[in-house]
Amino acid sequence: MTDEAVKIIVPGSEWREEVLSELKRLTEDLVRLRRFLVSEDFYKLSEQQCNLLRNQSTAMSQYADILTKRLQSN
């Protein structure tokens, strides 16, 4: 386990900021991805790539939900 992982797992003043920062970055990336999913360029991709990007969006949303719950639980 890396030092960074330990910081997030071990209760302290910094873990909350780490999780909040991760959630902010993730949310920004998710917004950009969702915009792309409805763009004309998205439909120029192969069916496989479109499906993978949709799956990625779902996974990112689930991850954001988990981070939010972690922040709410403490």
Q: Where does each model-flagged region fall?
A:
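Extended, charge-rich alpha-helical interface modules
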Residues: 2-74
